[in-house]
Regions:
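Intrinsically disordered, low-complexity acidic regions
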Residues: 112-181
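Assembly/interface modules of non-enzymatic eukaryotic complex subunits
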Residues: 1-137
């Protein structure tokens, strides 16, 4: 059985003339899932492997490169990229973003379907953000503790080095004094 690795991202994207949106993504080797919210309403985009393959082929890209570019632009707002969440009818939205490639501005977009339970979807996005924040805070605390321990050890090494240097000077002074006698 093939080991399927998934990665997650969640970003706050600024859309022109509108409130920011949040995009939580789950990235698989051959496709992705998006959950998008404006804080009130939520939408989902779950293209199949075949849909992603077709979209990548339209842009003459291997699926892996298509997914990497999508993750780059949806995982963190990129300077110069224009993001939009436009009406697609029946409560659905179209998420789009621009990017530069070989001097050309390209526009990628995916239709996002209205979530059957926006409250639940919003809670899932907030849970993900809170979990990520807690993990990041824990990591910062651990790294600060490690830094403090290393600082104490470095101070001990410096003290020991100074002591050894002083003992060496005393020893050399004694040897030279005996040699002069």
């Amino acid at each position: 059985m093939e080991d399927v690795t998934e990665r997650f991202s969640c970003s706050k994207l600024l859309v022109p003339k509108g409130e920011p949106i949040f995009v939580k993504a789950t990235w698989f080797p051959t496709h992705f899932h998006l959950a998008v919210t404006d804080g009130i309403t939520a939408w989902h985009c779950h293209p199949s492997e075949e849909e992603v393959k077709q979209r990548a082929a339209q842009w003459d890209l291997p699926v892996s490169e298509y997914l990497n570019l999508s993750e780059r632009y949806l995982g963190l707002q990129q300077p110069g990229s224009v993001y939009a969440l436009d009406d697609a009818g029946d409560g659905h939205k179209r998420l789009s973003w621009t990017f530069e490639k070989e001097g050309m501005t390209l526009l990628w977009r995916w239709k996002c379907l209205l979530s059957p339970d926006s409250k639940k979807s919003n809670v899932e996005i907030l849970d993900f953000l809170m979990g990520s924040n807690i993990n990041l805070s824990d990591k910062v605390v651990r790294e600060n503790e490690l830094f403090e321990k290393m600082k104490v050890e470095a101070e001990k090494c410096l003290t020991q080095s100074e002591r050894i240097a002083n003992e060496r000077l005393e020893f050399e002074s004694e040897i030279y004094a005996k040699a002069e006698e």
